[in-house]
Design a protein with these regions (language model features):
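Walker A/P-loop
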Residues: 17-37
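N-terminal amphipathic/basic helix or basic patch
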Residues: 3-11, 36, 164, 168
């Protein structure tokens, strides 16, 4: 496969010190470069496959990469940590959730579950759902989460009364998820940081 690589791609494959950033357009060979890099590390540099972590953005790309790497290192053992950010986060949380106060058999709330929980919290607080759209509250909670802003800090940093109200929902939302031993989709990445 290395014969199909251009000089810059070959350099990215063979660089073993420091980080490598591969930027290129669709169909330009990024997956081929990453696959060959992993194979090079396993075959030529004798890196144990279980010491390699590779992220992709889609399940399809992860499956393709796993297949390509398995063929490239045939018989040497392919890395088991090739997946999407969310799938990898889920895998880590299933093993380590106890360290952040959750059980390993946690539930994952989908958008329907999340919207229902936000609506329930808002109703209990006496909010009129036509005045405060639950989707707007959910979007704000997601932004806080992905920005690694915990509920208390979100309230403290609120710029107006509406944001304070959203932050109170966020705090209750977070408590309810923990009480139900559940994560939402954002948590599959965010909670791994904890």
């Amino acid at each position: 496969l290395k014969t199909e690589l251009n000089p810059q791609q070959t350099q990215a494959v063979e660089k073993t010190e420091g980080h490598v950033l591969v930027l290129a357009g669709a169909g330009s060979g990024k997956t081929r470069v990453l696959t060959e890099r992993i194979a090079y590390l396993v075959r030529d540099k004798k890196v144990s496959p279980d010491r390699i972590l590779a992220f992709t953005f889609t399940n399809k790309a992860a499956g393709e990469m796993r297949g390509r790497v398995a063929r490239a290192v045939s018989g040497m053992g392919a890395p088991s940590w090739i997946g999407t950010f969310h799938a990898t986060g889920l895998r880590i949380l299933r093993r380590e959730a106890k360290h952040i106060g959750f059980k390993n058999n946690f539930a994952i709330y989908d958008e329907v579950d999340v919207t229902s929980l936000v609506k329930d919290i808002m109703k209990k607080k006496g909010w009129k759902l036509d005045e405060y759209p639950p989707s707007a509250v959910r979007t704000r909670i997601s932004r806080w989460k992905t920005g690694l802003v915990p509920p208390g800090e979100a309230f403290d940093k609120a710029v107006d009364r509406l944001e304070e109200l959203y932050a109170t929902v966020y705090g209750e939302y977070d408590r309810q998820l923990k009480k139900c031993n559940a994560f939402d989709f954002d948590d599959l990445i965010v909670r791994v940081v904890e």
